[in-house]
Amino acid sequence: LERIRFDPAVDRLWFCGDLVNRGGQSLETLRLIHSLAIHSTIVLGNHDLSLLAISTRREADQRKVNPDLQRVLFADDTEILISWLRRQKLVHVDRTLGFAMVHAGLAPKWTLTLAEARAREVEEKLQGDGFFKLVKNMFGDKPAWGTKLTGFDRQRAITHMAEQKKKKK
């Protein structure tokens, strides 16, 4: 932040997911970004979603993940950080600035408005009572997106579509 001369009075930082499990300082990264509060905008990446899922597992299973993630999972402020991550978005659109941010790309057929609406479906589960069931069923490549999908199949497909990289033809 010193190098870029970050000034919280005028600057806002945008973080494009994968806040954890990159570079070996996940706990420090989360704490720093959390401390920036209103001076930052975040979208979740697949690594962040994985951390949320791991955070719901039994302690014995959490101890099997890499040491970097273990430091997050067993930190004194884990509950605060996990709760804060759960409140972040999958898609952020700033219409005033004319910019949008997602972690890795959007489904080619989705408009930003549609992407926001679909992302909100998953975000509501992340933030609400459906969190534990969502993260248990969130991962996997199937089914492919279809407008007739419902329940966890739909949420899994939305998460995948909001996190996928556009494939070259």
What are these regions (language model features)?
Residues 27-30, 34-151:
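Active-site neighborhood of divalent metal-dependent phosphoester bond hydrolases
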Residues 141-169:
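Conserved, helical-rich catalytic subdomain that frames metal- and/or nucleotide-binding sites
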